[in-house]
C-alpha cells in the first residue's frame, strides 16, 4: 500500500537565520541534549574507563594518581594505536605501573550482544553498554577494494520520527557518550583483527566511518565531536576527516559548528523537495525548513568540488519519486558542490511505504545526472538482517516485544 501524505496545517516556526537566534537555538539544543546524557563512564567498583577521554583528560587523571602527565601519551598509543584492553599488554609501561593503572582504571569495549552476517557479507553488531542499553553498528564491506564503511550510531533510539525509518519508531532513550561512540568502531576493529592501526600507505578494511546509524548526531553534538576528534588523532586510530561522513536530517544551527570545528564530510537526509511533503516524512523540517537547510549547506566550510555534500534521497513509490520531484531537486542544489545518493526504500515490519520501481528510479537518476550531478542508485546491503538504510532498530527490543505475553 502506498502511504498517503496529508497536508500539514500546523504553522511553521519562524526562521532562525540570524546569528543571535542561531546562538539561542544552539543553547536550547545543548540544554535538551543534557536531559538525555549518557551515564558516567565508571564501573561499579569506582574504576574509570579511559576510552573516550581527551589527551588533556588523560593527563589530568595521571596527575590525580601521582604520575607524570607523559603517561597519557603512552596510554593513548596503547589504547588507540595498538588497541590494547589489558594494562599487562602495555609492554613499554613497567609492571608496577601496570598494576597501579589496573587498580584505578579500565579500557573497555561495548559487549557484543548479537552479531549477524548478511548473504552479501554486511555485518551487523548489536552492542550492549554498561547500563544495559543497546545500539546497532553495521560494517559494509567493499571486497573489490578490500575496504569498507562502519556505520555508527550516536543515540539509543531517535527523536526525529521520520516516517520511512525503522529507527524512528524507537523512542529516544539517551545519547551515547564518547566512549560508546568510539567503542563501536574499536569493537568492530577487534572483530576484524585490524590492530595496530594501519599506517597511511596501508589498506584498511575499516576504512571509513559514516555517522548514519541510530539517532541524529547533531542532537548529540558534544559527544559525537569528542569521539571524532579521538578517532582523527594522528597518533591513535588516525582516520582522516576526509574519511568520516556525518549524516543529519537538517539540524541547521549545529551544521555551521560541525563544519568549523570538525571539517568532516556532510550528508543531508533530504528525501523530499517541498516543505509540504518534507514536513510530513521528516518532521524536523517544520523547525528548519528546506530553504534554511540549503542555505546552511552553502555555508558549510568543508564543502568543495573535491568534497561534495551528499544528499540522501530515499525513493518512495508515488510519494517523492516523480520526474517533477527530480527537476525540483536539481533546482534546489544547482549552486552546490553536491552529489545525490538515490536509495531504494528498504521495507521493514509495519511500514506503509513501498519502494519505487526500477524504471522510476532510473528516470529520476537520469534527470539528476543530466543536470551534472552524480546520482548513483545505491545497491541495498544487509536487507536480510535488517541492516540496510532505514532498517536499524535494536533487535533486542523487537524480540522482547514479540516475546511479551498478552495480559
From Swiss-Prot:
Domain Radical SAM core: 144-378
Binding site for S-adenosyl-L-methionine: 215-216, 247, 269-271, 346
Sorted UniProt keywords: 4Fe-4S, Cytoplasm, Disulfide bond, Iron, Iron-sulfur, Metal-binding, Methyltransferase, rRNA processing, S-adenosyl-L-methionine, Transferase, tRNA processing
GO molecular function: 4 iron, 4 sulfur cluster binding; metal ion binding; rRNA (adenine(2503)-C2-)-methyltransferase activity; rRNA binding; tRNA (adenine(37)-C2)-methyltransferase activity; tRNA binding
Annotated localization: Cytoplasm
List of residues binding [4Fe-4S] cluster: 158, 162, 165
GO biological process: rRNA base methylation; tRNA methylation
Free-text remark on how the cofactor is bound: Binds 1 [4Fe-4S] cluster. The cluster is coordinated with 3 cysteines and an exchangeable S-adenosyl-L-methionine.
Active site positions, chain numbering: 136 (proton acceptor), 389 (s-methylcysteine intermediate)
Gene3D superfamilies linked to this entry: 1.10.150.530, Aldolase class I (3.20.20.70)
Disulfide-linked positions: 151-389
Gene Ontology CC: cytoplasm
Cofactor dependence: [4Fe-4S] cluster
NCBIfam families associated with the record: rRNA_mod_RlmN
Additional note from the record: Reaction proceeds by a ping-pong mechanism involving intermediate methylation of a conserved cysteine residue.
Family: Belongs to the radical SAM superfamily. RlmN family.
Protein name: Dual-specificity RNA methyltransferase RlmN
Amino acid at each position: 500500500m502506498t502511504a498517503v501524505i496529508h497536508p500539514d496545517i500546523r504553522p511553521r516556526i519562524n526562521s532562525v537565520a540570524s546569528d543571535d537566534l542561531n546562538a539561542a537555538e544552539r543553547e536550547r539544543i545543548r540544554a535538551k541534549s543534557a536531559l538525555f546524557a549518557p551515564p558516567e563512564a565508571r564501573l561499579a567498583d569506582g574504576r574509570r574507563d579511559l576510552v573516550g577521554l581527551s589527551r588533556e583528560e588523560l593527563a589530568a587523571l595521571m596527575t590525580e594518581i601521582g604520575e607524570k602527565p607523559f603517561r597519557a601519551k603512552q596510554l593513548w598509543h596503547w589504547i588507540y594505536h595498538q588497541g590494547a584492553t589489558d594494562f599487562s599488554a602495555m609492554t613499554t609501561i613497567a609492571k608496577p605501573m601496570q598494576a597501579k593503572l589496573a587498580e584505578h582504571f579500565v579500557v573497555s569495549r561495548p559487549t557484543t550482544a548479537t552479531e549477524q552476517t548478511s548473504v552479501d557479507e554486511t555485518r551487523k553488531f548489536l552492542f550492549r553498554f554498561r547500563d544495559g542499553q543497546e545500539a546497532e553498528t553495521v560494517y559494509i564491506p567493499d571486497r573489490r577494494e578490500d575496504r569498507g564503511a562502519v556505520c555508527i550510531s550516536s543515540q539509543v533510539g531517535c527523536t526525529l520520527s521520520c516516517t520511512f525509518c525503522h529507527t524512528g519508531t524507537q523512542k529516544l532513550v539517551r545519547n551515547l557518550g564518547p566512549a560508546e561512540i568510539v567503542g563501536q568502531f574499536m569493537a568492530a576493529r577487534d572483530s576484524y583483527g585490524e590492530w595496530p592501526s594501519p599506517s597511511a600507505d596501508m589498506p584498511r578494511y575499516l576504512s571509513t566511518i559514516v555517522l548514519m546509524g541510530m539517532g541524529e548526531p547533531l542532537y548529540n553534538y558534544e559527544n559525537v565531536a569528542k569521539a571524532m576528534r579521538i578517532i582523527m588523532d594522528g597518533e591513535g586510530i588516525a582516520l582522516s576527516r576526509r574519511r568520516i561522513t556525518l549524516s543529519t536530517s537538517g539540524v541547521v544551527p549545529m551544521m555551521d559548528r560541525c563544519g568549523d570545528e570538525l571539517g568532516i564530510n556532510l550528508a543531508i537526509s533530504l528525501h523530499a523537495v517541498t516543505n509540504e511533503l518534507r514536513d510530513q516524512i521528516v518532521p524536523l523540517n517544520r523547525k528548519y525548513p528546506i530553504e534554511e537547510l540549503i542555505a546552511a549547506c552553502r555555508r558549510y566550510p568543508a564543502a568543495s568540488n573535491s568534497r561534495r555534500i551528499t544528499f540522501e534521497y530515499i525513493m518512495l513509490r508515488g510519494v517523492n519519486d516523480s520526474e517533477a520531484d527530480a527537476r525540483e531537486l536539481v533546482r534546489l542544489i544547482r549552486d552546490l558542490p553536491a552529489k545525490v545518493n538515490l536509495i531504494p526504500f528498504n521495507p521493514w515490519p509495519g511500514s506503509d511505504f513501498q519502494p519505487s520501481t526500477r524504471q522510476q528510479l532510473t528516470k529520476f537518476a537520469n534527470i539528476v545526472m543530466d543536470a551534472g550531478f552524480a546520482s548513483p542508485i545505491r545497491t541495498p546491503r544487509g536487507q536480510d538482517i535488517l541492516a540496510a538504510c532505514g532498517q536499524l532498530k535494536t533487535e533486542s527490543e523487537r524480540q522482547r516485544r514479540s516475546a511479551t505475553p498478552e495480559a
